[in-house]
Curated annotation (Swiss-Prot):
Gene Ontology MF, one: polygalacturonate 4-alpha-galacturonosyltransferase activity
InterPro entries, alphabetized: Glyco_trans_8, Glycosyltrans_8_dom-fam, Nucleotide-diphossugar_trans
Name of the gene encoding the protein in the UniProt record: GATL7
Gene3D superfamilies listed in its UniProt record: Spore Coat Polysaccharide Biosynthesis Protein SpsA, Chain A
Disulfide bonds: none
Lumenal-side positions: 22-361
Keyword presence, Transferase: yes
Protein name stated in the entry: Probable galacturonosyltransferase-like 7
Function of the molecule: May be involved in pectin and/or xylans biosynthesis in cell walls.
Length: 361
């Protein structure tokens, strides 16, 4: 188990070390970025893919511990002993996605029992991920950006408008029906604990599980027009909605399919196009549908907001306490800051998982 505390002096850079600490507090909320129509989802574009623009080192081979179930090399996606993880892949965040996968394998007691589902809108990424992780259990799914392009409205940040951010809305349709549960993870995080612990989250009657932050100012995620119109604000009637970050979720896909939550989210996106009820991209529709109906997960599984602000160069600190997942949500990403030689102290925790071949340490 990893416990992390940061110490800093007035004129010196912060030193990040691993220590024991009794409690965990969380950062203020930050928008999660990255993150029946099945034929459309799986239709690959006809244009020739562009050449690879990246070079990654081959990851070490990680084997199951002795007490794991016997790993079946030829086992398919429907093997009930598998832990399913879904992550998006695109060129801008590819380095982060590969670091996330590397971190999961490194800290998993049964890495050969983890199956990765990669969502892509660019088709030339599968060979790259397979060459980096030759023994990884994986499947790549093409997500057609046109599925959501007409539903996306302008946001406060252009990055929040990317169609692939909305692919998580369609996981229940994209993944095979035999996959009944999945962990969805953003591309700007690392896992420093056994992913199987997150997988075992008890959802009860809930469709998704995530760390909740009930101290956050929930009203700011929606416009005054939303709160002043009972047709919209009435969505939270009978609920006690709390903010949650959609970059780390355990999802019951079987229940999702049964209720038809993809269509419910799409309806809210259509309302947004005509009535402008929120500003923050793909997050508010999830809040509208699930806030107040989320199975709580320990905050250690999403220490989010570490990205800070690239424009102002602000850095965030970890609060004392146990940490199982570090999430660089926000506009600043560790690989950009490391390359510019202006890293934040916590970026050094991400660096060991970076497999990018052109980065020298």
């Amino acid at each position: 188990m990893l416990w992390i505390m940061r110490f800093s002096g007035l004129f010196s850079a912060a030193l990040v070390i691993i220590v024991l600490s009794p409690s965990l507090q969380s950062f203020p909320p930050a928008e999660a970025i990255r993150s029946s129509h099945l034929d459309a989802y799986l239709r690959f574009p006809s244009s020739d893919p562009p050449p690879h623009r990246f070079s990654f080192r081959k990851a070490p081979v990680f084997r199951n511990a002795a007490d794991c179930a016997a790993a079946d090399i030829d086992s398919g996606v429907c093997n009930p002993s598998l832990v399913h993880v879904a992550i998006t892949l695109d060129f801008e965040y590819l380095r982060g996605s590969i670091a996330a996968v590397h971190s999961i394998l490194k800290h998993s007691s049964c890495p050969e029992s983890v199956f990765f589902h990669f969502l892509v809108s660019e088709t030339d990424l599968e060979s790259l991920i397979r060459s980096t992780f030759p023994e990884l259990k994986l499947k790549v799914y093409y997500f057609d950006p046109e599925i959501v392009r007409t539903l996306i409205s302008t946001s406060v940040r252009q990055a929040l408008e990317q169609p692939l951010n909305y692919a998580r809305n369609y996981l229940a349709d994209l993944l095979e029906p035999c996959v009944r549960r999945v962990i969805y993870l953003d591309s700007d995080l690392i896992v420093v604990d056994d992913i199987a612990k997150l997988w075992m989250t008890k959802l009860g009657s809930k469709t998704i599980g995530a760390p909740e932050y009930c101290h956050a100012n929930f009203t700011k995620y929606f416009t005054p027009a939303f709160w002043s119109d009972e047709r919209f604000s009435g969505a939270f009637s009978g609920r006690k909605p709390c903010y949650f970050n959609t970059g780390v979720m355990v999802m019951d896909l079987e229940r999702w399919r049964r209720v038809g939550y993809t269509e419910v989210i799409e309806k809210w996106m259509e309302i947004q196009k005509s009535d402008r009820i929120y500003e923050l991209g793909s997050l508010p529709p999830f809040l509208l549908v699930f806030a107040g109906e989320v199975a709580p997960i320990e905050h250690r599984w999403n220490q989010h907001g570490l990205g800070g602000d690239n424009v102002r160069g602000s850095c965030r600190d970890l609060h004392p306490g146990p940490v199982s997942l570090l999430h660089w949500s926000g506009s600043g990403k560790p690989w950009f800051r490391l390359d510019s030689r202006r890293p934040c102290p916590l970026d050094t925790l991400w660096a060991p998982y970076d497999l990018y071949g052109h980065y020298s340490r």
